[in-house]
Design a protein with these regions (language model features):
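Internal alpha-helical scaffold of NAD(P)-dependent oxidoreductase catalytic cores
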Residues: 105-114, 121-122, 126-212, 236-239
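Alpha-helix C-terminal capping/helix-to-coil transition sites in glycosyltransferase folds
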Residues: 51-52, 131
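NAD(P)+-binding Rossmann beta1-loop-alpha1 motif at the extreme N-terminus of oxidoreductases
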Residues: 1-51, 270-279
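Rossmann-like NAD(P)(H) cofactor-binding subdomain of soluble oxidoreductases
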Residues: 52-55, 63-124
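Electropositive phosphate-/nucleotide-binding environments in soluble metabolic enzymes
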Residues: 29, 68-75, 98, 141, ...
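NAD(P)-dependent Rossmann-like dehydrogenase/reductase catalytic/cofactor-binding core
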Residues: 2, 52, 145, 193-284
Length: 284
């Protein structure tokens, strides 16, 4: 069984490292020679030229640019892979806009596709690495069986959902949920500051309840995933005022802390995942 991991950046690098430990015939692919050389230094086959494979794991970055979800890299990888092997299983681990996988299956006449969004946290890779519970949705029963066999062989536990779309949405919704939690904390922190109330003491107090886990409010919601994913979800469902409000809250919070009102350090520390012990995230 030949496996090719397409995209060797933040998503693909840990994936290709893990896959290569299980499948001897594993190759990493990236258009960046620097990324390819980094993988080669780890003793893993990698190239800027795509090879034929039985399974392609697509792990390239997706973007939200100029007000639109940009899935062009996903489509390019899919097109290249199916050109080399029309019967290959395509496993999308990248974050996708709802409907992306099905549209590509129809456009390129593929009957073997699955969506299994990655979950990985760089800050605690030993605990929250590649091997953790994943959501998987497939195009059909045959694709589901092939994908389950693949991930079971990798030792990755799977929660199966009924469709590609549910799997796509699950990634967007979980990251948006985390965005909302941080935005609420940011808004509350500003309110506390205006009313001379200790936000940290209040947060510590409310987090003593078993079903409350209030996020930290630090230096704004940054990183590669959270700001992008909430925008992609809004593209799908634009009539969600709560999401628009959260983005506005974070923008307002950033503007306020730019003048250092909380006595924080002048350098900005962006938040993608919160590493507070009371507020664990499973990464992107």
């Amino acid at each position: 069984m030949n496996v090719c991991v397409m995209g060797l950046g933040n998503i693909g690098l840990p994936v290709v490292q893990h896959v290569s430990k299980v499948y001897r015939q594993t190759q990493g692919y990236d258009i960046s020679l620097e990324a390819v050389n980094a993988v080669k230094k780890k003793g893993i086959d990698a190239s800027t030229e795509l090879a034929c494979a039985d399974i392609y794991v697509i792990a390239v970055n997706t973007w939200h640019r100029n007000g639109y979800s940009d899935m062009s890299a996903i489509e390019d990888c899919t097109k290249q892979a199916l050109k080399l092997n029309p019967d290959a299983l395509i496993c999308f681990e990248s974050t996708l806009a709802k409907g992306t996988a099905r549209k590509l299956a129809e456009k390129y006449n593929s009957s073997n596709m699955a969506v299994c969004p990655h979950r990985w946290w760089k800050q605690e890779e030993d605990k929250y690495g590649v091997i953790q519970l994943r959501v998987l949705g497939a195009l059909n029963q045959e694709s589901q069986k092939k994908a389950l066999d693949f991930y079971n062989t990798l030792g990755i536990p799977i929660h199966v959902v009924s469709s590609l779309e549910i799997a796509e949405l699950s990634k967007l919704v979980e990251n948006t949920y985390y965005y909302l939690r941080i935005a609420y904390a940011e808004d509350l922190k500003l309110l506390c500051e205006d009313n001379r109330v200790s936000f940290e003491e209040l947060r510590e107090a409310v987090n003593t309840k078993w079903n409350v886990d209030m996020a930290e409010a630090r230096d704004g919601i940054g990183g590669e995933c959270l700001p992008k994913d909430i925008q992609i979800l809004i593209d799908t469902y634009p009539n969600m005022p709560l999401l628009h409000g959260a983005i506005s809250t974070d923008k307002n919070y950033r503007a306020k802390i730019a003048h250092n009102p909380f006595g924080s350090k002048p350098e900005t520390q962006q938040i993608e995942e919160n590493n507070n012990s009371n507020n664990k995230s499973h990464g992107t």
